[in-house]
Every structure is written in structure tokens, then in C-alpha cells.
Regions:
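Short Lys/Arg-rich cationic patches that frequently serve as NLS/NoLS or arginine-rich RNA/DNA-binding motifs
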Residues: 4-6, 27-30
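Bacterial N-terminal signal peptides that target proteins for export
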Residues: 2-13
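Conserved functional acidic sites
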Residues: 27, 34-190
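Hydrophobic helical h-region of N-terminal Sec-dependent signal peptides
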Residues: 14-20
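C-terminal motif of bacterial Sec signal peptides marking the signal peptidase cleavage site
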Residues: 21-25
Length: 190
């Protein structure tokens, strides 16, 4: 789980760097921001453990959301800290590969590698796809974390397997008060 927090921090840095300027002009309209009002375009965004019920035909591996575009070949290099405060390096690369997810959606593979003193300590293939509304969905990950000299894959999950479900990585129309889940895998990623 500590490596998962590091990975999320790196991905968040990449997304926030793109999103912050866009949200600077967002304000609250005083409207309803409950989960029932979590709308983006014409789709309701997923909340908590409710199933997403996705149509694979509504998705593309071409991710051009203006708040978090993922063109093939894009790469981010970030510095993160582990729970002990030690500096780590992270490289996130949008691969020219796709994966058919268990729920039927074909997703873009994004490789995320965390390095400690130049040696990989975590490698992850994250899976993303964009719906017709422009929302970027997160479909899980195949991850390996180096723990006590051994690679641990227990953080891996895939939407459509063992009750895991997709979530939103970036809404098409982000706004203050918009709520949605990022991922769901009961007992592992909630």
C-alpha cells in the first residue's frame, strides 16, 4: 500500500499540473453537489461501490481530455517522497500499447516506474480509456513492488474481475464540488 500511495502521488502531480490553471476560474454556483448530481456531460459519474455498467463501444484509447491528455509517447518525470521522507524518482510513460480489460473496454497502457537511487522499486502498467463525453476512466493496474528483496503483485486489480470496477481519473468537465470515485475493488481500492 505504501508504494500505491507513491504511485498515486506521481500520477496526481502530472494531472494537477495540467488541471490547476483550468480550475482557477471555477467557482461554486451554490447548486447541489451531492453524489446524485455528479454529472459530466450527459453521463453520471461513478460513486462509491455502485456498478459502472459501461458500454465498451463508448470508449477509445485516444485520450485527448484537455485537463489530462495522454498522447502516445508522452512522458513525465517527477520526484516523490516515500513515507520515510526519502526522495524517489518516478517516470510515467504513455505506451503505444493497449489492453482489453475484463469488462470489455480496450484501454491505453501507461507505464509507471518508481526508482530509488536509480533502481526500480515499483513497476506498474495502469490502464486508461476515454469515453465519448471526454471523461478519462481508470481500469486498474498490473503492479509489482519490491518488498524485502521480493516482487509483490498484491496491488494489482482489473475492472471486471473479482468485483473490481472502473473509476474516473479525470472528468470531462471538472468543477468545484464534482464527486466521483477513482477506482473500486472492495477491501483493496475503495
Amino acid at each position: 500500500m505504501k508504494a500505491r500511495a507513491i504511485k498515486r502521488a506521481g500520477a496526481a502531480v502530472a494531472g494537477i499540473a495540467i488541471l490547476l490553471p483550468a480550475l482557477a476560474g471555477c467557482g461554486s454556483s451554490g447548486g447541489n453537489t451531492s453524489s446524485a448530481a455528479a454529472q459530466s456531460g450527459t453521463n453520471t459519474l461513478p460513486q462509491t461501490s455502485e456498478p459502472s455498467n459501461l458500454n465498451p463501444a463508448d470508449f477509445s484509447t485516444n485520450i485527448d481530455n484537455p485537463y489530462w491528455p495522454m498522447p502516445v509517447g508522452a512522458q513525465w518525470h517527477v520526484h516523490v517522497s516515500n513515507p520515510q521522507g526519502e526522495s524517489l524518482q518516478e517516470t510515467i510513460t504513455v505506451e503505444d500499447k493497449a489492453k482489453k480489460i475484463a469488462d470489455g473496454v480496450t484501454a491505453r497502457v501507461v507505464r509507471d516506474v518508481v526508482y530509488d537511487h536509480g533502481k526500480p522499486t515499483e513497476t506498474t502498467d495502469d490502464w486508461y480509456a476515454q469515453d465519448k463525453e471526454g471523461n478519462v476512466w481508470y481500469f486498474g493496474e498490473n503492479t509489482a513492488t519490491l518488498e524485502n528483496g521480493k516482487w509483490d503483485r498484491s496491488g494489482s486489480f482489473e475492472a471486471g474481475r473479482n468485483g473490481a470496477d472502473a473509476g474516473i481519473a479525470m472528468a470531462a468537465n471538472p468543477s468545484v464540488g464534482l464527486t466521483y470515485r477513482e477506482e473500486y475493488y472492495k477491501g483493496h481500492a475503495e
